């Protein structure tokens, strides 16, 4: 077993690994971690379907990857995760191709935006980060289940420490909106979703939730100095790291290649067979109560009752039920 850490890069994770014959789908693939994930997987011989909502940005990212990896086998697909009709249209179109998906990487997301709603009226962060991926994943489940050793990777975050999910008020209809609390709810939802996938389909599917670390990407486009300060204070209040790390909020920045490494590791390694459903960070299995800026998590994210209830709530919100096994 190779030993990895916070500075491990995607290329180091895939050193000596052949992904020939494997098909990956990556959401949010038009920039940042998604684009780097696609580049790395392509360099190891994988076929990759890049999914994003902006056609110009998606085509530009695909062109950059083709220049970097001339032998790459890329497809693209347009999906707006803030629009359930867009998700349904894409899934219906994709399933007509009868093409198995070996690994789905739910990478797309929005962070700490001002209060706004999706096309269907859901609070934007919960609606995009969780509900959009919840619907897309379930609609694509026939293709995933027909894949070879299928996996579903959900991009979560240390941001889950800001808040657990709210089953009573997911859209902030009766409580005051806070950008970081909303982000925390959505990132906790990603983990509960992962856990419930495993409970329902773990005999066939491996699923992991991933903390990428802190990376400068388009995800931070809504961040103001005030929001950054609030984030640091929130992390410091929850950090179990050293006093020195707490002074900076325990927020070491990573390169793009290091930031995407954990999700690439989760999508490809054979070292996680005994850890199905785990929360991962720095290419390691998560540690309850550990430093959240590394691979630490709060215990509420492994609550089975919450995961079941969130699944039921999500079905109600997207107005569609899915098989339990």
PLM regions and their residue ranges:
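NAD(P)H-dependent oxidoreductase Rossmann-fold/reductase module
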Residues: 1-84, 88-89, 93-104, 111, ...
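A short helix->loop->beta-strand "cap" motif at the edges of active sites that frequently abuts
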Residues: 46, 147-150
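Short alpha-helical oligomerization interface
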Residues: 113-128, 174-176
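Amphipathic alpha-helical dimer-interface segment in Rossmann-like NAD(P)H-dependent oxidoreductases
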Residues: 128-148, 164, 198-199
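Extended catalytic-interface subdomain
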Residues: 153-154
């Amino acid at each position: 077993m190779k030993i990895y850490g916070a500075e491990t890069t995607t290329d180091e994770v895939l050193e000596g690994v052949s992904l020939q014959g494997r098909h990956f789908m990556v959401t949010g693939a038009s920039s940042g971690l998604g684009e780097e994930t696609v580049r790395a997987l392509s360099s190891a011989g994988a076929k990759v379907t890049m999914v994003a909502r902006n056609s110009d940005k998606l085509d530009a990212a695909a062109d950059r990857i083709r220049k970097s990896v001339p032998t790459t086998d890329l497809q693209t697909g347009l999906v707006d995760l803030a629009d359930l009709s867009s998700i349904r249209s894409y899934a219906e179109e994709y399933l007509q191709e009868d093409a198995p998906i070996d690994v789905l990487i739910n990478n797309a997301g929005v962070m700490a935006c001002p209060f706004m709603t999706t096309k269907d009226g859901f609070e934007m962060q919960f609606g995009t980060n969780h509900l959009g991926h919840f619907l897309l994943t379930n609609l694509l489940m026939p293709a995933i289940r027909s894949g070879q050793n299928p996996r579903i990777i959900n991009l979560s975050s240390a941001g889950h420490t800001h808040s657990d999910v709210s089953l009573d008020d997911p859209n902030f209809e009766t409580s005051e909106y806070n950008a970081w609390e909303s982000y925390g709810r959505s990132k906790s939802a990603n983990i509960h979703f992962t856990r419930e996938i495993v409970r329902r389909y773990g005999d066939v599917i491996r699923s992991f939730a991933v903390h990428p670390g802190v990376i400068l990407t388009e995800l931070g486009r809504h961040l103001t100095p005030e929001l950054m300060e609030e984030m640091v204070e929130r992390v410091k209040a929850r950090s179990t790291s050293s006093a020195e790390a707490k002074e900076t909020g325990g927020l070491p920045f990573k390169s793009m290649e290091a930031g995407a490494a954990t999700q690439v590791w989760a999508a490809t390694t054979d070292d996680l067979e005994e850890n199905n459903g785990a929360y991962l960070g720095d290419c390691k299995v998560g540690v309850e109560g550990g430093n959240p800026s590394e691979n630490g998590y709060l215990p509420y994210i492994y609550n089975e009752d919450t995961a079941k209830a969130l699944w039921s709530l999500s079905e109600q919100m997207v107005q569609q039920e899915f098989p339990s096994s």
